[in-house]
């Protein structure tokens, strides 16, 4: 299946000069959505995953079906003020500004093997902050998976030696 057929391209969104890759058509097609999630599940099967972690909001959309298929839990990464209990946080640079991400401080147990799932790898700020959060709790990041990588933004440089899977490159 050619997943790029299910990605809408929007020029100059959310600001002038940005090309936005919209995954909504992929999610709206059950076969394409299932195919994408299954590809990530196949990548993760031999990694002995204990927990899937996904940044808000589209990391939830991709990460939850992956966690379900793997038979493991899902831990959300949220913006400040969105989680009701004690949190840890990490600040990062993104494509158009700076942001902070949080997780409940008990989301990951020391030694748990974690797969991080998100829709997009752009500048790498979100993934770097998510890795930092998981590792602050003693988790072991055993892989990362993305629907899309924007190659020219070089986000892979922030992943370092972490193994990762990408389904589509732009």
Curated annotation (Swiss-Prot):
Give the location in the cell: Cytoplasm
Chemical reaction(s) catalysed: AMP + diphosphate = 5-phospho-alpha-D-ribose 1-diphosphate + adenine
Q: Report the EC code(s) recorded for this entry.
A: 2.4.2.7
Keywords, A to Z, come to: Cytoplasm, Glycosyltransferase, Purine salvage, Transferase
The pathway where this protein functions is: Purine metabolism; AMP biosynthesis via salvage pathway; AMP from adenine: step 1/1
Report the InterPro entries cross-referenced here.
Ade_phspho_trans, PRibTrfase_dom, PRTase-like, UPRTase/APRTase
Which GO terms of the cellular component aspect does the record hold? cytoplasm
Q: Which PROSITE patterns match?
A: PUR_PYR_PR_TRANSFER
An annotated Gene Ontology molecular function: adenine phosphoribosyltransferase activity
Function, please?
Catalyzes a salvage reaction resulting in the formation of AMP, that is energically less costly than de novo synthesis.
Similarity comment text for this entry: Belongs to the purine/pyrimidine phosphoribosyltransferase family.
Please report the name of this protein according to its UniProt entry: Adenine phosphoribosyltransferase
Organism whose genome encodes this protein: Lactococcus lactis subsp. cremoris (strain SK11)
Tell me what gene encodes this. Answer: apt
